[in-house]
C-alpha cells in the first residue's frame, strides 16, 4: 500500500470508530422531570398560566391558544378581546422585591415577545381572523403574593396598534401612551 492509501484507510477506520461511539441525539422528552410535567419551576409557571387564563376568561376575553413557541421565544396566552388580538405574558413573584413581577418585563423581554409575535402572527391570523388583521395588544398578568394584576395594553406592536389613542412612538417602534 502506498503512503497516501494507508493514511486514507486509517482515516476511514477512525471515522467509523467515531461514528460507533457517537451519542444518539437527546430526545425532547429526555430532560429531567419531563415525564411528570416538567420541573417544579415549570409546573409552577403552568399553574399561574392556567390561573391567568381562567381569570381573563371571567373578564370576558376568549382564549385562542396557549404556550405558542417559535425560535424567537414563547407567548404564554393568545386571547381575543372583541376585535383585538391580545398576547399575554404571565409573570409571578413571591415577593415584591426588585420591582415585582411586572417590572421583570424590560425592553429586552418586550423585544423577544415582539419577535415571537411577528413569527406567530401569520398562523394566528389565518386561524382566527379572516380578512383585515386586527390590532395586536400585549397585556401582562402579574401575580404578586398570589393575586393577579392585569396590565391592559402594557405595550403594542407599532404596525398593529389601534388608530385612536396613539400618543407617539419610541425609538424601538413601541406605541407610547
UniProtKB/Swiss-Prot annotation:
Disordered: annotated span: 13-43
Q: Name one Pfam family in it.
A: UPF0102
Coiled-coil stretches are: none
Q: Name one GO molecular function term.
A: nucleic acid binding
- SUPFAM superfamilies under this entry? Restriction endonuclease-like
Highest rank taxon of the organism: Bacteria
Write out the similarity annotation: Belongs to the UPF0102 family.
Q: What is this protein called?
A: UPF0102 protein BPP4042
Amino acid at each position: 500500500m502506498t503512503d497516501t492509501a494507508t493514511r486514507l484507510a486509517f482515516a476511514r477506520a477512525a471515522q467509523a470508530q467515531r461514528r460507533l461511539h457517537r451519542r444518539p441525539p437527546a430526545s425532547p422528552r429526555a430532560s429531567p422531570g419531563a415525564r411528570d410535567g416538567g420541573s417544579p419551576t415549570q409546573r409552577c409557571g403552568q399553574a399561574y398560566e392556567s390561573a391567568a387564563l381562567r381569570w381573563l376568561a371571567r373578564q370576558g376575553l376568549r382564549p385562542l391558544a396557549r404556550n405558542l413557541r417559535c425560535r424567537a421565544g414563547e407567548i404564554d396566552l393568545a386571547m381575543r378581546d372583541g376585535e383585538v388580538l391580545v398576547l399575554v405574558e404571565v409573570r409571578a413573584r413571591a415577593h415584591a422585591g426588585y420591582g415585582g413581577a411586572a417590572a421583570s418585563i424590560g425592553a429586552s423581554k418586550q423585544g423577544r415577545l415582539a419577535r415571537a409575535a411577528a413569527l406567530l402572527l401569520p398562523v394566528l391570523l389565518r386561524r382566527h381572523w379572516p380578512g383585515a388583521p386586527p390590532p395586536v395588544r400585549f397585556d401582562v398578568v402579574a401575580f404578586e403574593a398570589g393575586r393577579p394584576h392585569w396590565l391592559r395594553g402594557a405595550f403594542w406592536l407599532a404596525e398593529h396598534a389601534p388608530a385612536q389613542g396613539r400618543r407617539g412612538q419610541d425609538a424601538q417602534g413601541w406605541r407610547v401612551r
